[in-house]
Amino acid sequence: MNFIYHKWKYIIAAFLSTLLLIWGVNVISIENKHKYIPAPLLGQEVDFNQDIRPIFNKKCIACHGGVKQSGGFSLLFEEDALSVNESGERAIVPGSIRKSELINRINHTNPEFRMPSEGEPLDKKEIALLTKWINQGAKWKDHWAYIPPQPQQVPDISDPWIHNDIDKFIFAKLNKEKLLPNPKSDRYTLLRRVSLDLTGLPPTLEEMEAFLGDDSDLAFEKVVDSLLASPAFGERWAAMWMDMARYADSKGYEADRPRSIWKYRDWLITAFNDNLPFDQFITMQLAGDLLPNPSEEQLIATAFHRNTMNNDEGGTDNEEYRTVALIDRVNTTWSVLQGTTMECVQCHSHPYDPIRHENFYQSMAFFNQSADADIPSESPTLVDFEEEEDKQKLGRIKNWVADHPGKNDSVYYEKLIRITEPKLHPHYFEQMDKGLPVRGTATFKVTDSVYSFTKQVPLMGEDRLMLRYRADTSVGTLQIRLDSKDGKIIGSLPVNRKTKTEYNKEEKKDKIYTINETVSFLVEPAVGTRDIYLVLEGSAKAKTECVIEWVMFHHALPGQEASGFGGISTDFYDILNSTNEKITTPIMLDFSDGYRRKTNVFEKGSWMSHGDEVEPGVPAKWNPFTPTMESNRLGLAHWLTDPKNPLTARVTVNRFWEQLFGLGIVETMEDFGSQGFAPTHPELLDWLALQFVHDHKWDIKKLLKQLVMSATYQQSSHISDELNALDPRNYLLARGPRTRLTSEQVRDQALAVSGLLSPKMYGPSVMPEQPDGIWQVVYSGDKWKTSSGEDKYRRALY
């Protein structure tokens, strides 16, 4: 008993002593509030972005940021930092260091209580800055990149070296650093530099002789204008964009099967050569299909986000890999257009920047209504018919619909024929075998013991059902039923190995007699949201099954009573099942409202663990997503190209600057966040961004001409030992650029100077010569077939 008493006596005494020590230390540190503030800091205004945020990011954010919020305290968002944490205290109380727990903790001498709890403690200057910042009201500022570009006064400076306003910004900073820029490059070097930069190709001997022989003041400008007008210009800049669009002529993953998407590459070349304004360039790629009456070019542009990988391996979960593609689209959009690292937000709030976990899934909601899925056919695709026979059939069908008005116009039927857009993929169906679920993959089977169904299908009075199936023999009749497996039959299809659709004039209806597995047959029109069941009434054979790839409802062709309808009907089904040569390009299309998916937050980033449902939206620190913007990809495109967006123009001009100067004004081109590099010339960056949007009207060629006409670009790249020691990375731009050619440019240059380079543009991708064994895939069996003739010597982007 005495032992217990003495034990508690010492514990209580130690506890009271500790409390006194803590209270005493805190009182001392608070009473002498300027104790750690060096004299030079006492009078200065503390700047959050310059002085405070770097301390938080370096010493605090690992435990009190987007990934972890120890003690319920986060420094990522102002509202969180100033709120009450789990202890009931406020870590930061503006204007009061006495009430700010943060000041107590960073001054504490006891390691158990001092913050940061791990690593080196804050030094005296850091403590002084935090103390003074809170004393001055703890004024929080948004990171510079999230504030829209601000109008800048061009430096009032003159010098014979200066060519345009860009040079005034550069010269002013050099002047401040007591440096002088280099003189102009020699004409040979300058021509080679600008030719490689603007077209990716070296100048020809004729171009070199013409430039060297032109002594006029406009000689260089004439060269620049000629290069901007060259077809090679579009090829050079399309190659740059293809890297950001993750372009490939194959699908990726283990099989890495071929993909026909070269029409998107050709669209890029044309867009750059035609100088499509950048805001339209972005809008068409993100949402060309959602524009009013989209053109073929606008549809092909959407292949930007069909460059995601596709897993053709058997046994994979289609929804899982569809989700992987969605995540890739979110990350690519934010990286390419906003210079923002979004990948980590899939699992948690951003570690350093004001982007919450749910913001990732709000972004994903913009893309979640797309009709594509992880299936081998890569539908939806845009079909281009190569054979004149098929083109004529399509023309006759369009003319027929125009001459016989019905529920839908010719655009509807052209889309039905040219765009493989099945609404109901296998993964929308559930299969039941004797009351037990059967897991589907890329296709699903309907047998005499299995039925399949999908719920909540919006029907709008369509009177035909189209589906694609495979059957090895005559297997019975496929019934389409409403609401249950024993529900009302609205249509039926005899499933045969080989059939063909023909129009029976006497019965005024189609016979089912289709070849090549795509069939369309009459169904009783229904309206509303219904459950659809596919039930096979099989034959007596032991193996009775029909493998279905997709299902869709549509409206019949108009004018069934008119003379000649039989021929048009035959044309319609012939072209749907044509085996003639055709080109298919994967494109983006959204489901109609009735098929819309819900989007949920993935808990810890797992696609199988759904949290709260979210609607399309953007992070709060960016420009607002206004009510006039549609809650789809088109609305996202309008938000990104809104002049109020703080990043789109900055990121874009920075990217083009980097291509010419070798280093961006912001060196971390894909990270404009607080962990990225600050701009070397922030005023110039904002000035260029505002010029690009308001003065140039998003004109890429005008921007590039402005850059290459500057003395900054044209100066010699010679570097002295002194300058190399002072500025080895050329941040100050006291010399001209020294940039490496890309591997593709090295190859193109070698072919060009040897006289072998083919000027042929556009068309399917080619396979130039390469050593045996380089191109190998695991199990697809695809072979590298070396192209012949001039196709072996085309530019690398082909």
Regions of interest found by a model, annotated:
Residues 7-8, 25-131, 138-166, 171-172, ...:
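Solvent-exposed helix-loop boundary motif
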Residues 395-578:
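Extracytoplasmic
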Residues 48, 118-140, 378-410, 538-540:
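C-terminal capping alpha-helices of c-type cytochrome domains
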Residues 115-116, 223, 227, 250, ...:
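Glycine- and acidic
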Residues 2-15:
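N-terminal Sec-pathway targeting helices
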Residues 158-193, 197-232, 246-292, 353-354, ...:
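Primarily short, surface-exposed interaction patches in extracytoplasmic proteins
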Residues 12-17, 22-26, 219-356, 363-364, ...:
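Extended surface/linker regions that mediate inter-domain or inter-protein docking
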Residues 259-283, 302-305, 311, 331-342, ...:
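Non-catalytic accessory/assembly modules
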